[in-house]
């Protein structure tokens, strides 16, 4: 019993005075309370904007040089990291190895709670070793309360291997100091249901991960304007989206867009370059490869040649 760490002082564990009578509210009052409290997530993101921007810049540079991005967490934090990583291949046509989610307990913990596994820092360290993390990589440790041993074990192992380390926590640094390269604090206050960090802490973490991964992909040239030009055309919904992107950006008819997409091998970015620079698929792809997949740079080079 004497080895159990007292966490009552942590912001995420404190009692929210606004929800003291949660069990006595009408249903509409309960919904209104959640809505009011969730507004804190927007403020938290705004307060962490500089650190988020730093994380985007550092990570995009690392990935642009062949590095990888790892999210590490347990419970809700781990699931959110895995979710964000899983969305990168279909949205940005990235290799599944480029952005990876690591959760305490592995795949089984995605659907069944394995909270006891978060107390093993050695497991976090072993997960980093198993991925052969190097100085080229970026490791983001996600922990709402900032104290998760599994996450700390992973971050410490990543530092020893020379990787860039980023922390994402929902408690002030003075409550839980974490020695990392970039320290992102997302302070949303005590939860409506005391200690349930799947609520505001989970929501703000998802928002931050959305911004981080999307920002990185923008910097890597996987977006043109606000269109996902590296979308992986793997089902009818995404095929339709690819066609609409081509129609909107080229003013081609839907049939013409479909023919262009087919000639490009269903690669939207290449299709755009082929159309705008009047190139065939082979030359267009070579031009993209020579400009690290950046459409604007490849287009400028193609038009100047």
Swiss-Prot record:
- Alphabetically list the UniProt keywords: Carbohydrate metabolism, Lyase
Report the EC code(s) recorded for this entry: 4.2.1.126
Which PROSITE patterns has this protein been placed in? GCKR, SIS
SIS domain boundaries: 59-222
Quaternary structure annotation from Swiss-Prot or TrEMBL? Homodimer.
Stored NCBIfam families: N-acetylmuramic acid 6-phosphate etherase (TIGR00274), PRK05441.1 (NF003915), PRK12570.1 (NF009222)
The name this protein carries in UniProt is: N-acetylmuramic acid 6-phosphate etherase
Organism whose genome encodes this protein: Crocosphaera subtropica (strain ATCC 51142 / BH68)
Traced from the root, the source organism's taxonomic lineage reads:
Bacteria, Bacillati, Cyanobacteriota, Cyanophyceae, Oscillatoriophycideae
Task: Identify the gene encoding this protein.
Answer: murQ
């Amino acid at each position: 019993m004497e080895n159990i760490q007292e966490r009552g002082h942590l912001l995420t564990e404190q009692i929210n005075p606004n929800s003291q009578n949660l069990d006595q509210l009408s249903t509409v009052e309960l919904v209104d309370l959640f809505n009011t409290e969730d507004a804190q997530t927007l403020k938290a993101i705004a307060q962490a904007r500089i650190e988020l921007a730093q994380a985007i810049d550092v990570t995009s540079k690392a990935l642009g040089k062949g590095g990888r991005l790892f999210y590490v967490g347990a419970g809700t934090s781990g699931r959110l990291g895995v979710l964000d990583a899983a969305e990168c291949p279909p949205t940005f046509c990235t290799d599944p190895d480029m952005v990876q989610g690591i959760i305490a307990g592995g795949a089984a913990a995605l659907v069944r709670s394995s909270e006891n596994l978060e107390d093993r820092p050695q497991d976090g360290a072993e997960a980093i070793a198993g991925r052969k993390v190097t100085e080229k990589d970026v490791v983001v440790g996600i922990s709402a309360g900032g104290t998760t041993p599994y996450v700390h074990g992973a971050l410490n192992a990543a530092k020893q291997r020379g990787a860039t380390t980023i922390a994402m926590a929902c408690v002030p640094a003075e409550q839980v100091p974490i020695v990392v390269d970039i320290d992102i604090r997302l302070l949303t206050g005590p939860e409506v249901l005391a200690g349930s960090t799947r609520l505001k802490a989970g929501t703000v973490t998802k928002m931050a991960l959305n911004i981080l991964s999307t920002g990185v992909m923008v910097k890597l040239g996987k977006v043109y304007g606000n269109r996902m030009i590296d979308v992986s055309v793997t089902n009818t919904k995404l095929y339709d989206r690819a066609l609409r992107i081509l129609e909107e950006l080229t003013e081609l008819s839907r049939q013409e867009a479909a023919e262009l997409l087919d000639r490009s091998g269903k690669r939207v970015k290449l299709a755009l370059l082929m159309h705008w620079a009047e190139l065939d698929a082979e030359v267009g792809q070579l031009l993209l490869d020579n400009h690290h997949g950046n459409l604007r740079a490849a287009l400028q080079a193609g038009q100047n040649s």
